[in-house]
Structure formats: structure tokens, C-alpha cells
Amino acid sequence: EHAKSSTYKANGTEFKIMYGSGPVSGFYSADTVAFSGFHLPDFTFAEINDYSGLGIAYRVGKFDGILGLGWDAISVGGVPTVMKALVASEQLDEPVFGFFLGNNEAGELELGGVDPKHYSGDFTYVPLSTETYWGVELDEVKLGGQGVSSTKMAIVDSGTSLLAGPTSEVE
């Protein structure tokens, strides 16, 4: 649908990204990207033209794309992330984001802060254990009050719908 945009620029550089569920590939392009009041002119993004390596849910689901919220260290091809571009353009009050995952209502992604209507009390901040993924150190994992895991790190990943870990501990 490039013809519908007067600001689209073909880059043509090819890429391949390996996700936990399989590879995707395509090429880079640039265009003005606008959403939720944010505006990023000449923003470089990846156009996926082969996602056949992903699971069936991705092939039959109705997706328009993926909004990467990871760190620069895992950005393929050195392309700046959406968060980095929003921070650099001073469009965010704070370089943070928050998710609200509703049970009976639509979820929300809040860029630049968190929506106080979705929580009460204070946040507990923990240091990141890595700046490749949103990794945090764990003291203990409990199930029904019993310690169940020797795993000492977790990755908080908004791009997956599953919990994963060592087979012997998650079965």
C-alpha cells in the first residue's frame, strides 16, 4: 500500500529477524509514522514479507504489525527503536511505558508513563539485569507457597503470550 503514502521511501536493505517462534524477513522502508498523538517523520521500520516460519496463530491471525519495545542492543540492522525515536524527539514525558491487561475490557499501552486509573499504591522498581531484553533478577519463584524454581532471571516480554523456562521446572 505504498502508493497511498506521499512520504514513503523505499530503503531496500533486506533483514532477517529470529523470534522465539521462528524467523521473519523482509526489507527496510521509511515513512511518517503517526499513532496516538505521536508523530515520527521519516521513521525507518521493517516491512515483513515472509513470516512463514512463524506458528499458525501468526499466519491466520489478523495482525498489522509488531511494535518493538526492546532495547537498541537487539534492534536488527542498527535501526532506532520506536521508544528511542520518541525520546529523541522529546514526545514522551518520561522514557517509560506501561501495559494494562484487562480481563473483561480492552487492554492499553501507555507510552511516556502509566495510567493511574489502572493501579493503586506505589511501584516497586527493580534494576535490569541486562539491557538486551527487559531482564530482571529473581529471588524465588513460588507456586502455592512452595519454591518451585532455581531460575534466577526472568524476561518481561510484551511480545509473547507464554511463560517459558527450564523444562524440568515448568512442566
Where are these regions (language model features)?
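Soluble non-cytosolic domains of exported or imported proteins
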Residues: P23-F27, A73, G77, A164
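Short hydrophobic beta-strand that contains or immediately precedes a catalytic carboxylate
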Residues: I66-L67, A154-S158, A164
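Short, surface-exposed charged micro-motifs
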Residues: S25, G98-F100, M153
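Acidic, glycine-rich loop-and-beta core segments that form the ion-binding/anion-interacting portion
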Residues: V141-G144, D157-G159, T167-S168
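Aspartyl protease catalytic domain
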Residues: A34-S149
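Classical protein tyrosine phosphatase
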Residues: E1-T7, S161-E171
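Signature of the N-terminal lobe/flap region of pepsin-like aspartyl proteases
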Residues: E1-Y58
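Extracytoplasmic/secreted envelope proteins and their assembly/folding machinery
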Residues: A30, P80-M83, V170-E171
